[in-house]
Amino acid sequence: MPYLHRSLRPQPQPVPGDARTIHSSGQSFEQLRQGCLQSGTLFEDADFPASNVSLFYSERPQVPFVWKRPGEIVEKPEFILGGATRTDICQGELGDCWLLAAIASLTLNQKALTRVVPQDQGFGSGYAGIFHFQFWQHSEWLDVVIDDRLPTFKDRLVFLHSADHNEFWSALLEKAYAKLNGSYEALKGGSAIEAMEDFTGGVAENFQIREAPEDFFEILEKALKRGSLLGCSIDTLNASESEARTSLGLIKGHAYTVTGLDQVNFHGQRIKLIRVRNPWGQVEWNGPWSDSSPEWRSVDLEEQKRLGHTALDDGEFWMAFKDFKIHFDKVEICNLTPDALEDSALHRWEVTIHQGSWVRGSTAGGCRNFLDTFWTNPQIKLSLTERDEGQEGCTFLAALMQKDRRRLKRFGANMLTIGYAIYQCPDKDGHLSRDFFRYHASLARSKTFINLREVSERFQLPPGDYILIPSTFEPHQEADFCLRIFSEKRAVTRDLDENIDIDLPELPKPTPQEEETEEEQQFRALFQRVAGEDMEVSAEELEYVLNAVLQKKTALKFKRLSLLSCRNIISLMDTSGNGKLEFEEFRVFWDKLKHWMDLFLQFDVDKSGTMSSYELRTALKAAGFQLGGHLLQLIVLRYADEDLQLDFDDYLNCLVRLENASRVFQSLSVKNKDFIHLNINEFISLTMNI
């Protein structure tokens, strides 16, 4: 696959209405639907076929599933029946309670729900077996188109379904989300906050309940009023505890939805209550304030009605907030915008987005524990210029998300352990070196490195310039990431890898023969013996000359220069264009080669005859090539071996091609030093010659 440059520059916050359709046909939902209506056919989605490939990638169904359209399951199917509510969500035979908890939370915010579940579809007029749903993914909204064939067994939906068997919006939403992530199996296991963010483009904040602030009830209450999506769960100590039921009816390792908070009068006291929903649609808390507990007998009937108290086993229940804090461990809040939950006033936050990659051998440096490679990670400069209203510092929230890991599960990819550190920026600009991190500690960091899709943290720092370094915990781990910076006042962010600066010295003029050094005279004799009277060598002859000379350099450990390197050298130095190298051209190159050899020996730290690819950035800069992260990634992919090492031949080949490309660009960019204009013939000619 050809390389496509992915910019790390800040991206604008996307407009939710501008969703991009990702169907392989290139057509929008409406175009596809109209095509089906005109042809009188029901839509069949070739991108997500009604077969096992869309169900599982590592197993097979234990019973034969039959894909059926809603009209083949019930007589009168409805898309949404009586409004989309949290009771429309009942878990099936798939371990995606985290997704169902997020959908239940989504139903509490009508505006967000309408965006994810467009209302321009149904089983009435205009029905063509096609539906669409919108999800946020890494800075943009995607419109996911599906057909309405659903997996069934004995005419019952196998996976997510509504309590009313005629209603299908929730089952179709689950299918669209499965398509987005590659299969239904990809939805097994997760955190509710992941789907909440995909439903809103919001930003997550996580609370360990035992460490929560004193006003935690008010924080949650305010979050619900602002339309935030809330989930909660109970931790497990080991895998055997997953979905184990406690004596009070709670399920460990299971995702619940927080659907309400309130207070009631009880024996002259105001009791704080929290309403929680189990996406199974059954199995509830059976302690104080549960559906049939005696506490409700002391509550006025009007008050019970206001709270929606029922004794149905529908998976939703009230419990005292003090009991909630004892029995639950974690609360996840997805803020539609990261409004400060501790303040009563709403704020409009500024948002910048950076897309980047950790690439093994060049930008996958790991955390600060790995000093030798940590500095090679992407570095984002953050300039905080304005203090918050009435505050001494500047508030911002940094959210680091690893991309597409769920979609890549079928290929063995798991969530990586990620986090970030923030440093005071020194006066000088440019990518910070290893020595900086050797002598400077971070000012702030994510609380922990953790294997979640996103790590987010709120900070308040004095005005100034800072460097934020996102990384995996271990080095050499590859992933794409999305970094979002939310700030109360305008903040300027810039990627430090973007600056490319190439400093090429002027080519020296030929030295008169009578002024040649003893070494040059020896070269002339060897050159003349190989080249003959015309004093020009071919690539094969140059290979012989250079290897004969370099084999005598005992400090330089390498097998031999390749013919490819010699061809590239001639391409760089051949001014006549005859494919051969004259002696004067060779002498100029020899001066370069001596300098490049000295650099190689300097960065061959263990004197093994190879250089670590992580040292390449510094070595190239010393040779006059300050390159951005994406170029370094390309170079490492091309020249480093599987152990992330470059031998001298690879190193030399890289430098020769870099200088050749740079000099060609300089010769063509006469009017504008940043751009050149080429037609297809010129472009291909150049690429074949570099």
Curated annotation (Swiss-Prot):
GO terms for molecular function: calcium ion binding; calcium-dependent cysteine-type endopeptidase activity. Predominantly expressed in stomach and small intestine, although low levels of expression in other organs. GO terms for cellular component: cytoplasm. Its EC number is 3.4.22.-. Residues 338-521 are annotated as: Domain III. Residues 518-552, 561-589, 591-626 form the EF-hand domain. Keywords: Calcium, Cytoplasm, Hydrolase, Metal-binding, Protease, Repeat, Thiol protease. Ca(2+) 3 binds at D574, S576, N578, K580, E585. It holds the Pfam family Calpain_III. It is found in: Cytoplasm. Residues 42-337 form the Calpain catalytic domain. Ca(2+) 4 binds at D604, D606, S608, T610, E615. Ca(2+) 2 binds at E284, D291, L312, D314, E316. Residues 522-690 are annotated as: Domain IV. The active site is at C97, H254, N278. It comes from the Eukaryota. Residues 1-23 are annotated as: Disordered. CDD domains: Calpain_III (cd00214), CysPc (cd00044). Ca(2+) 1 binds at L81, G83, D88, E167. InterPro entries: C2_III, Calpain_cysteine_protease, Calpain_domain_III, Calpain_III, Calpain_III_sf, EF-hand-dom_pair, EF_Hand_1_Ca_BS, EF_hand_dom. Belongs to the peptidase C2 family. Calcium-regulated non-lysosomal thiol-protease. This is Calpain-9. It comes from Mus musculus.
